[in-house]
Amino acid sequence: MVKILKTTLRATTMLKVLVKIRLSLFLTFSVLCLMPIMYMASHKTIPNEFLHNFGGKIPKSIKLETRSGLTFDVQVTKNSGRVVLQSGWASYVSAHDLKIGDFLVFKYSGDSQLKTLIFDSSGCEKVCEKPVDMSGRSYDIAMRNSQDEKKKRKQRDISRQGTVKPSEEGLKAELVPGCILPSRTDLTRLQKNILIEKVKAINSETPIYGYVMNNSSIHGIPCTVEISKKYADVYLPFEDGTVVLQHHGKSWNVRCCLTKQNSKRFLKGWRQFAGDNKLHLGDICLFDLLKDKKKYVMDVHIIRRK
């Protein structure tokens, strides 16, 4: 505990300088909220002194916006008279690799939105990985996964990752630019070529999530589609919510929730979508997240297995 307090004190001292030098553009007439990370938890309490920014009306959810423009929807609850950031906070922590001794700077920018800056214990700012160029276009990608997380993904059952049985010409999924697929997904050369052309034709502003239909997603009880942690942490930053799937002018409400492995799954509503669109084993669904500030909406493109 003494070590933690010393680390926090050092970070606080550094921030006094940073507030004067590096945060000059961040400061307006709004009050900043400075919060040290002294222990890791699935929630974060907002200091009472900061709550007056909300005008006495505490919203049920707020958006946390990072310097790189990514936003995270976080549910707000009351616990023992304190206002707490709860559902969705864990995704924010994971995506930014927060550690004990890090320091958060929150600025209320109106409309239930907080702009955030993150500093490590040395006072250096931590920023989400910036967009990188993939086949001539820029995409926001998730923070790098730790080596431990990579090992866990390798140990997962292939059948739960939406894979097609490997063949002699199997190709790794990450070779498809602009498309995130579950780890260890193997594609035939024909599937890869079709997928590349389809992703280019969609021309999405954000990475597309692809999933190959397997027994769990067609005949499973429950019938599910798993969304990889790499994609879900950044683009579906909530623990339990509804995603609207659109295909050929129709829409389906599908429940999306967190799993024990910290990935996410489509559950209630997915079986109806799969049945209505006559999905079969080996079909590939491409989920294109649309920009909608009020809800999560995805256009679904289907590549039939021939």
From Swiss-Prot:
Cysteines engaged in disulfide bonds, as pairs: none
Record bears the keyword Plastid: no
Q: A single GO CC term, please?
A: nucleus
Q: Which Gene3D superfamilies match?
A: DNA-binding pseudobarrel domain (2.40.330.10)
- Residue range(s) of DNA binding per entry: 29-122, 210-306
Where is this protein chiefly located? nucleus
Check the record and name the Pfam families matching this protein. Answer: B3
Residue ranges, annotated region (Disordered):
139-166
Q: Name one GO molecular function term.
A: DNA binding
Q: Where in the cell is it found?
A: Nucleus
InterPro entries reported for this sequence? B3_DNA-bd, DNA-bd_pseudobarrel_sf, REM16-like
Q: Species lineage, top-down?
A: Eukaryota, Viridiplantae, Streptophyta, Embryophyta, Tracheophyta
Identification of the protein by name: Putative B3 domain-containing protein Os03g0621600
Sorted keywords for this record are:
DNA-binding, Nucleus, Repeat, Transcription, Transcription regulation
